[in-house]
Amino acid sequence: MPPGGVGVLNMEPGAWAFAGVAESLARALHVPVVDRPAHWNYCFYRPAGVDADSFIPAEAVRVASDKRLQADLFAGAGVPTPDTSLVADLAEARRYAQRPGRWVLKYPVACGAAGHRLLTEDTRLPKDWPKPLLIQAFVEMDRPEVYGLYGAAGRPFGWNVRRYRDDVPDPSPWVAHATGADYELLGVPPAGAVEAAAAALNVAGLNDSFGCVDLLPSPGGWLALEVGTDGPDAHVDRAVPQPLAGEINEQIHDAFWNWVSRT
């Protein structure tokens, strides 16, 4: 093995935000958490400009951190999604509120649905809201829920759904663990969901490493909402029930060490 070895890279000043997940994954991979790049790295926080050979490609991490980049890539590759547009300003965005159905103004660089809002003709935004603005059709459901599928080195796993308990008062339309939704593990994923997830991970550059996809059913088939992965801005939620929590680490373990053996 070359000098420098293998490690889970988690550097200052952002290491505190990823300490728990980095230590857990390091135990699963049987490698140390390191504060400087190793020869092979599973990267959580590293400052901009720090080069490291990373299991999850840096460009894929960048795509996963910005829903606008995903929207462009999904559209170009024909990944099935809800009707989505990037618009220059709020005046153009408000015109979507005049269309049939409801529309979402999605905050493009946050996780856990933070910042999302339903668009109206009276919508106001902070001056620092990132542009272009990301507009997406709101998929109406009798019971709000979002499905999820993970992928590691091209292998789909962990089919699940997030939904609110019946006793949750006034549930948020943004179905996320951060807004109080619970995970429920499911059985074999539908073929259409697997196909949509694989297409999304592939175009995002995550097919050979690790990522997850949020999905919704529609009359025309399964739709990909967004992809996520581990990186300096966020990490895939590990607060999931067993056996999924263990399976995430197992799947990453196998995919990571396969990458090490090939590079």
Language model region names:
Residues 206-208, 217-263:
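C-terminal active-site "lid" helix and adjoining low-complexity regulatory extension at the edge
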Residues 78-80, 203-209:
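Short secondary-structure junctions
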Residues 2-95:
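Conserved N-proximal alpha/beta basic substrate-recognition cap immediately N-terminal to
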Residues 86, 151-152, 217:
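Generic beta-strand structural signal
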Residues 62, 110-111, 140-141, 156, ...:
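Short, solvent-exposed loop/turn segments at secondary-structure junctions
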Residues 70-71, 106, 226-230:
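Active-site ExK catalytic segment of metal-dependent nucleases
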Residues 116-204, 223:
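Phosphate-binding site of ATP-dependent enzymes
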Residues 74, 97-114, 131-142, 161, ...:
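ATP-grasp fold ATP-binding core
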